Amino acid sequence: MKQSVIIVAGGKGLRMGSDLPKQFLPVGGKPVLMHTLEAFRKYDAMLQIILVLPREQQDFWKQLCEEHHFSVEHLVADGGETRFHSVKNGLALVQAPGLVGVHDGVRPFVTLEVIRRCYELAEQHKAVIPVVDVVETLRHLTDAGSETVSRTEYKLVQTPQVFEVELLKQAYGQEFTPFFTDDASVVEAMGVPVHLAEGNRENIKITTPFDLKIGSALL
């Protein structure tokens, strides 16, 4: 079955306090985004990789690829107004039938095992997302203040989120709403159940300077 991945990288680095978009910040001597693409190429040499970038960042990305002699083959699609529209633009380059994953460009530490697990389970379940346990205590805000909730009833969601191509294309044919916070929420809006797979704790989303320090330590 043909497999593809859409890697979404539309960050502007605001929480980093940097003028350089977070996906381009260096970790271990090269941009975060290059580590991410390499993780998926290691998973499958034939995997179709589609990188979604804002148009105004694409020339800079090409420059970085030349400077770092980056040779992982990939297509580039234009970023959209929101993540929803960016994924939709990437999907336009994916042909059915097959499986397609959607991954955050600033999650470079996803393991091969998690990638493989999500794609394999998607062959059976059609919609799969990686999750990890909540280890912190959670509180629910109420009109009266707040209250403790059982963390065993919650999971932290990661990427790649993997789906049948036809299913995800149909889901992204829906009208956008702010409640679409990830691809699973878009699919669930059609009443399709989403299967949970075990993720990896190191698969953090690099969005703050502290995350960069963690990333450097992981390398």
UniProtKB/Swiss-Prot annotation:
Pathway it works in: Isoprenoid biosynthesis; isopentenyl diphosphate biosynthesis via DXP pathway; isopentenyl diphosphate from 1-deoxy-D-xylulose 5-phosphate: step 2/6
Keyword NADP: no
Any one GO biological process: isopentenyl diphosphate biosynthetic process, methylerythritol 4-phosphate pathway
GO molecular function: 2-C-methyl-D-erythritol 4-phosphate cytidylyltransferase activity
Reactions accelerated catalytically: 2-C-methyl-D-erythritol 4-phosphate + CTP + H(+) = 4-CDP-2-C-methyl-D-erythritol + diphosphate
Site (Positions MEP for the nucleophilic attack) location in chain: 151, 205
Matching Pfam families: IspD (PF01128)
SUPFAM superfamilies named in the record: Nucleotide-diphospho-sugar transferases
Site residues (Transition state stabilizer), renumbered to this chain: 15, 22
EC number: 2.7.7.60
HAMAP family, alphabetized: IspD
Family per record: Belongs to the IspD/TarI cytidylyltransferase family. IspD subfamily.
Annotated function: Catalyzes the formation of 4-diphosphocytidyl-2-C-methyl-D-erythritol from CTP and 2-C-methyl-D-erythritol 4-phosphate (MEP).
Record-linked PANTHER family: 2-C-METHYL-D-ERYTHRITOL 4-PHOSPHATE CYTIDYLYLTRANSFERASE, CHLOROPLASTIC (PTHR32125:SF4)
Protein name per UniProt: 2-C-methyl-D-erythritol 4-phosphate cytidylyltransferase
